[in-house]
A protein has these predicted regions:
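Bulky hydrophobic segments
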Residues: 1-159, 175-180
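Individual transmembrane alpha-helices with interfacial aromatic-anchor signatures
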Residues: 159-172
Length: 180
């Protein structure tokens, strides 16, 4: 379990380190757009905006890092194949082994990571639950395709696993957040 939790330390530090710079960079455009749309800026809007920036920064760092130090050597050594079988994690529940805890935690964290997106969709856009469902699925698909393509060709191979179950759990997490 500690190994699983340790895998979050570098992305967490990266996102928290990068967040203040993004806030400074995006504050003026956010305030200008808010003034144009609503003609006022409230503290709750500022707090919500900074929280959203932190969420999306964290999402990027958690889903795309760590990156391989030597991409060419990584690609020659590892051949990551997409996991395209929906609900294959059920086998680990029915027949537990040494990976069951890790896989369970990964599924739970995928749901947890997308709950804030659903909350954001409901609070900011005031749309129907179908909007949250579609948004969660599309953002999750963007992340998975980014992982599958090695950040759209920046890396010579896929260095993260494309997993169809991530699409399912992330979309569910977004919908759950919308329902809260």
């Amino acid at each position: 379990m500690l190994k699983f939790l340790n895998s979050f330390s570098a992305p967490l530090i990266g996102s928290l380190s990068f967040w203040p710079f993004l806030c400074i960079l995006l504050t003026i455009p956010f305030i200008i757009s808010r003034l144009i749309m609503r003609r006022r800026v409230t503290w709750s809007y500022v707090f919500f905006s900074y929280g959203s920036i932190l969420y999306f920064t964290g999402l990027i760092f958690f889903t795309l890092s760590p990156v391989p130090k030597d991409p060419i050597a990584f690609c020659q050594t590892y051949h990551i194949q997409p996991q395209l079988i929906p609900f294959n994690w059920v086998n680990y529940v029915v027949h537990p082994d040494k990976d069951t805890l890790y896989i369970t935690l990964q599924l739970v964290m995928n749901i947890v990571f997308f709950v804030p997106l659903g909350i954001f969709m409901k609070a900011y856009f005031h749309k129907h639950w179908k909007f949250a469902l579609l948004s969660g699925f599309l953002l999750s698909m963007l992340i998975e395709v980014t992982q599958l393509t090695g950040v759209f060709g920046l890396y010579p191979c896929s260095y993260r696993l494309f997993d169809v179950n991530d699409l399912i759990t992330n979309t569910f997490g977004c919908l759950l957040g919308f329902m809260l």
